[in-house]
Amino acid sequence: MKKVILLGDSIRMGYDKYVKDALDGVAEVFYPPENCRYAENVLRFAHEWKAKGAWGDDVDLVHWNAGLWDVLELFGDEPLSTKDYYASVIPRIDRRLRMLFPKAKILFATSTSVIEERCKPHFRRHNSTIEEYNAIAVSALEGTGTIINDLYALTSGMPEEYHSDAVHFYTDRGTEIIGGRVLSVICRELGISAREIKLEGFEPEKYSADNIGY
């Protein structure tokens, strides 16, 4: 059976259980029981999540994202991570993941779009900034062999009703579309097939609001 790791922020927390259930019987799917937040946090804690989860060295694929926290503007300040820092830390994470999971294919997902007008005044994200940081990440990963899963392109045209708030897609259609895209790239890269998940009666992971963190 294949082994898959999902690392990422609260966007990942919206589809992780969906992916896990869809791959039941063909792949073991693991992920941290928390929001991985900004890129530096992934660099700092990836090895601890591996150890605590007992994921082992035989992982076949890692799908990860980090960026929405990096672009976050608190109280009108600049993004939490500068562009230069983000450009330097993304390839460091890539190298760390390859060290921790030497047999794994590495997939990076771009950060998803937001509804800017629904962001709180002191807690803002801008799609133009997200686009810039996504481009920085993709450029920084060139030549590494990392596969890009463009979730920004997938979500940028989504109807507002697919969103659960300014940032998240915790709706049936949002989960189905984003989870479906993640599943499709995982299945393509590992040569496996997912089973259909019916949203009626589906139960996502029960993360608390504090754990999601936004």
Task: Describe each model-derived feature in a short phrase.
Residues 101-105:
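A short helix->loop->beta-strand "cap" motif at the edges of active sites that frequently abuts
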Residues 17, 21, 51, 95, ...:
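Short, well-ordered alpha-helices that flank and scaffold nucleotide-derived cofactor binding pockets
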Residues 65, 109-110:
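Alpha/beta-hydrolase-fold catalytic nucleophile elbow
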Residues 51-55, 78, 110-111, 154-155, ...:
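A general structural signal for short secondary-structure boundary/capping elements
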Residues 27-29, 106, 148:
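Generic structural signal for residues in well-ordered beta-strands
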Residues 1-92, 203-214:
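Conserved SGNH/GDSL esterase-like catalytic core that processes O-acyl groups on lipids
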Residues 86-96, 133-137:
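A general structural detector for well-ordered alpha-helical segments in enzyme core domains, enriched
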Residues 112-214:
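Catalytic His-Asp segment of secreted/periplasmic serine-dependent ester chemistry enzymes
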